[in-house]
Amino acid sequence: MAAAAEAAAEPLVSGLARLLQDTGDLVLDGSSTLTLLTPTLQHLTRVFEQHLGSRNQHRGFVALPSHPAETTAILQAQFLFDMLQKTHSLKLIHVPNCALQSTVKIFPFKSLRHLELRSVPPHCLRGLRFVYSQLESLTCSKCVSTLEEIISACGGDLSCALPWLELQTVNFSYNSITALDDSLQLLNALRVLDLSHNKVQDCEHYLTTLSELEYLNLAYNFLSKVPNLGIFSQSKLLTLILRNNELDSINGVEQLVNLQHLDVAYNLLLEHAQLAPLSTLHYLKKLHLEGNPLWFHQNHRSATLVHVSPRAASSNFLLDGEPLSSSDLMHLPKLVPSVSQSIHTSTSEKTILDRNALDSSCAADFSDSQSPAENVAVRLPRKKGKGKVKVRRASISEPSDTEHESQALPFSAGLVLQHQKEMERMDSFRDRFGVDWLQYKRLEEHNQVSVICRSRSADETTGRPAAVDLQSESFDPKQVKPRLSPKESSPAFHNAGAEEEPEVQPGEPPGGEQREEEADELMLGEEEDEKPEVDLCQPVLVSQIEGEGDPESDWIFLRVTARHVIEVELKAARVLHKLELKCLQKIETSEMTWKRMDLERVFPVLTLHFTYIRKDRQKRKYVVLDDCPEQCLQCVLEVLSPVVEENWRNQDQEKESLRLQCLKCKHEFLQSLAPWQQGPYPAETGDTKNLETLVALNQDASAAGEPIACPSCSSDHVVILPSEVSSSTPVPPSHDGTSEDLSDSALEGGSQQEGPEEVPALPRESGKFYIGGEDSSEMDTSNSTRTPELSGEHDSTIQSSSHSTDGGYGKKEQGMKSQYLSLSHRDTNGGSLMGSYRYSASRGPTSSQLSMTSDSEETWNLSPSANSALNKRDFRSVDHRLKLYLDMEVFEENDEEFQCFLKVTMVKFGRQGEFLSILVASNLRIYVLEVTGVIRGQPADWLKKDDSHYLSDISHLEVGLCHQSLRMEFENPKASYNLLIRSQSCCDQFLQTLTYLMQELPSKHRSKVKEIPTVEMNPQHWLWPLLDSKNTDSAAAGGTCFFYLLAYLIQEYSAPNWTQFKLRPCCQIDRTN
């Protein structure tokens, strides 16, 4: 056996020797990489051990004997061994299905500089410890799960951890690494690190040890935040790729001051305000944001450029791979000079500025409130005008303002000067305003605005409630009574909200404050109100608590105005955050023990809950550090608690109000119901009893003399909008009974669509009829007894006009569940004959329904509008969430692009019954996605890909009867689908869109479809034999050319009577043919 194996392997050795003799010079100079399979290297190792003994185990270079060998095999072995010793680049590949019989040894490679391992098990690799100190690049793919098994243990050598002195490039992409480890400390000279396509969730602190890093690729992982880097690598990193992760912010990139390429595409960035850290990246050249939710914003590029550094955008900047256009450049923020730039201004520049200022007799007015940005805003010297000399008023500056003359000081002296000016400025405020110097703006405006200021004197506290228990008190308006009546609190808020803009002081140039605010907006990404706001209480010194940790070291001032809770920086008085009071939902107070100034004591804690979407703004927690924290907290609570109660009252009013819609102009508005309008069932009750119908409501309103009219067009034809958003998924009917409202104009025919599963209906307060922007007019009824005006004694044939709507309600047994029927609005082209029925049982809410309602998950609108003429654009407009799902999970080829889609009920040949699906067409394929659940939430939860076919494989297209369906047949593999579109205009437009896609294919891939037939009702149609022969004969004798198919519907399940409705003809049969 061994002899046979050696004989079979001899051609391998001789062939490799001849190959290296011909092209070995490319391998020796490093321009080509020697690629070997693991079995080949194992055989070469055995040959070397057989003919050359143990000399291949030596660590250094081995010199071969100079005398000629006896056989050709020994000569070839000596040649190959000599070549491997001088090889600089090696690529070692292991076939996964081939089991390794022994270890893979790389001892012969003495001069190795570049090593690449593909699917090689690390524990089977031997000899890495002899070459690790000279390797310059290392690539491992599909073979490692941790870094330390290669970097620390050197594979199967299991050696001690030593530094890799020359290693500059590490590529560990396409592995199963879940976490980093301390082995990265051994890579002192690393410049390029690629860990893409792994399973890393958090880099923690391990990347901080890489001091020379210039390129970092962590794409296609599960990171939720930007990785932390060391101080040295922060200034050296040039490229950061974080594509396809789970980032919801880019906080941390502002420290990468020399970054040139940033890729955060396909993450979870929601708002453009989260891009504020980009303003400090002055050398950024490439920015990729595609695939994020903010990328789908219609003004994405202009909203992004607001946060990009103007210095970076002015030099060949690429946003999402495209250069900036002239319209994009208009949205760039103005370059605001910073304090550091003003300090670094050269002495010669400042001398020229002073000389020009003196020559033009235009001395600058340096006042107390002048910002540092203003001092450098006039860098360019003015040209002397030839016109009249303007007479200027002299401005007398404060003694502290004369310090601007010493501008030619060194950098350290400039910092001292800035600090000295700030101190003198504070002293002047103290002298002018006394103990209330921190509120100098409010004191200057006291003539215009009445200020609410509360103190803790004994006289004022007589009319207040008892002191607040700060241990576990929670200000929830549902449980706590109002502390201040609306009469006491409302004037203060109205006065504060109606304040006028204060006059600008003579010594305060308004331009400086605006430039400072623009700079703050650029840094924070938040819009600051230029109009000053009046404080409703004294500013409170607090420290913010993040999560459940200790308070932050930076203290801030907490200001409360009529509209905002403002966080102000303690040192520079810069606004950090503005939180709107109208979003304040709840206030909580508690206590915590904290050590301050070597004194451990109990401090009160204030927690504010807001209704923001952003997580970091939903809850703000502060520890009060003022001199009298309890008194300050009490003052804040007296101001904020009426606001919370007012917010809850507004929410209750919105719930009690009725959402109405005008039938004439479709304007939507809110209307508060009077007691005479609410009927016997108040809106507060959680029962499913409904309000009266629109006719009864208008009759009552007319009787009271107060008709409900549209505020836009003054029309009194209004309807009640549904309070709950119903699912767009069809729901199968139950047998409990139905209640309908059918008319000549609204009925379109019908078969019932059955969805994949029954959708639970949310509780409804009233019966509603809705004409909306979608494809249906809906009338909902819930279980209640009929009013006398709408009793069963009326005629069963129901008609409707444009002026009034009469709803027919069936009688309900006690405890019987009711249903509502939703009919599609008739197509404007008049071609739709089959309606889209939706049934949903109206019953009490279950726990799962309540949780679904509380989560407020967004529903999906996947149906094109039928209130206007359809066109191709209706099928191409897709929700960005669905498009992202198609790109990531459905499309099978990289160059596929979405073209159109259609939500339709489908019947597949070979499968029993119909099913709801979404038909998606790209530029190459057609995909059938089955709807498996409620259309709500993530697409992966309710979509399943069934089939996919190439557009070029379409072999037959056929339009169904009356253009209500479309049949498609495919080849390779053979399949047939019948799309039950049930709308003539929708069918025709979708067929036209599909035909256009087929024509856009290359000529060699064009479809084989030559013509598209349309099914007609004739004796060859399969419905023809189903007609009654007697009726056919009698009709022919009477000379009738057409027959009409009538539809009958059971009014009640247990009732024997049948109700006939006037319908349009469903089938027309021409007997003359």
From Swiss-Prot:
Biased composition (Acidic residues) is annotated at: 515-532
- Gene Ontology cellular component annotations, sorted alphabetically: cytoplasm
**What SUPFAM superfamilies does the entry give?**
Outer arm dynein light chain 1 (SSF52075)
Compartments annotated for it: namely: Cytoplasm
User: Which keywords does this chain's UniProt record carry?
Assistant: Cytoplasm, Leucine-rich repeat, Repeat
Q: What residue ranges carry the coiled-coil annotation?
A: none
Key word Repeat present: yes
Repeat (LRR) positions are 166-187, 189-210, 212-233, 236-257, 258-279, 283-304
PROSITE patterns hit by this protein: LRR
Q: Which InterPro entries does the entry mention?
A: Leu-rich_rpt (IPR001611), LIP1_N (IPR031782), LRR_dom_sf (IPR032675)
Residue ranges under compositional bias (Polar residues)?
Answer: 779-788, 843-859
PANTHER family associated with the record? NISCHARIN RELATED, SERINE_THREONINE-PROTEIN KINASE 11-INTERACTING PROTEIN
Q: What is this protein called?
A: Serine/threonine-protein kinase 11-interacting protein
Give the organism, scientific name: Gallus gallus (Chicken)
The major lineage groups are:
Eukaryota, Metazoa, Chordata, Craniata, Vertebrata
Gene name, please?
Answer: STK11IP
